[in-house]
Amino acid sequence: MNKIPLLIVLTLCLFLSCTALAQTKRALVIGLGEHEDAAWNKINGDKDIPYVLEILNDANYEQIVTLVNEQATKANVVSALVSLEHSCQVDDIVYIHYSGHGQLMRDAGNDESDDLDECWIPYDAYRRPCDNDNGEKHLTDDEVNVFLNNIRNKIGENGKMIVVIDACHSGDATRSNDETVRGVEDVFEAVKSWLGFSSNEENSNIHSNTERWITLSACESHQVNVEMNNPVVGKLTYALYTKIKEKKLGDNNALFKEIRKFVNMNTGSRPQRPVMSGDDKDKYNITDILL
């Protein structure tokens, strides 16, 4: 009589064990310090990569894709995001990292309150409109949002996902010689025709910017993201690396407080405050993803 309940318990334990083993940690890491267009300010986003990889390897990530400098074209970044979506399974853990320039682009979809899209800058994106790039080489927040939501749909509500953006979407014309700023002050005036629509109603591919994950950003929207000098690395990347290596455990508020404290201690005269956002920031901990 007791054998049947015992068999049920053993079967349940085996099922739970298999479910846990099926959970896969996957990452996409993008870092740019070089660009096809020489007009971009020299930065060191590529030097963030080793620090990120050390964190991920320590956390036993099984699938890690890196795109560095000339590898990180718009087409390759999009392909990597789509491939990540296709490989993901329910309950997976996903880490996405972007270190590079950011730029504001005049919003072609009219979905932004200020008519400006925040863009990641792939290797083949140009700082100003030209024959090589009329805006199609920039990766807008609208596009990124679609890819990220597709990934979220694949991993399901119990999957965990974080996006780390060590960039800045506004620059500073007063940049000094001893500071390296990720971002530029000029707005890219996109040619709307390349998007294939002329009004918001015609654009069925632009989704509302739901954020069903945790996002760590290097600074607030009105601030600049200044790199560290020693070591030469992104400030948010190095803050996250340092605190994870120090095993700063606890909930997200505790870890983020440590990250902000580190950035503040390594910031000069201009303030830089990292931002934690996303619907999931109170649902699970960053340490669940990186430890």
Which role does the model predict for each range below?
Residues 18-291:
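Cysteine endopeptidase catalytic domains of the caspase/legumain-like
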Residues 1-8:
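Bacterial N-terminal signal peptides that target proteins for export
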Residues 8-17:
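Bacterial N-terminal signal peptides
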